[in-house]
Amino acid sequence: RNEVTGKNTNSELTLFAITDVNDRNIVNVNLLTHLEYERVVYLVTQKKMKVKAAKKQAQKEVFGLLGIDATDFSNSEDLNIAGASDEDGALLAFSLMFQGDRSVADLTALLQAVANDMEKDGTWDDEDTRMSIAEWAADADSAGRLTAIRNNVKSWGLSNSVTKYEKYVRSFWYSEYGLGDC
């Protein structure tokens, strides 16, 4: 489903994840796990890091793309956009900002471009795209769309409430606009 519109999409979005499935029954594959994927592969194969350490570093870097401090967060594959935790709210904010008003094809292209950009150094250097995401977030916030998005996710019936995600959306666009903490 599309978090922004609340509707099912007509196209498939293929996402990847790397996780240890030995001690788990559920893996939530999401935009974070997808963006971590190439970075984790690079850190493990080229920098000879252990998978667990590579995943932790990649998760911190991916959340850092939008200025979110994920130091104490659970693994990305444990997060759920319908969950109740603060970190679940960060996932929801991250997902909807990347989704924006993009088609599945445009979202796929964006995700691939970001994953390719950050694969070797963990950074995303495309300032124009960062600003376009910030502009979408600012417009959505000022137009009251964040409330509509909350209602979309709640209407799916996956949980009784939707965790607060708006602070992450606002923090990102405030930062990109040079407003600091408002």
Residue ranges of model-derived segments:
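Feature for extracytoplasmic/surface-facing segments of secreted or surface-associated proteins
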Residues: 1-182
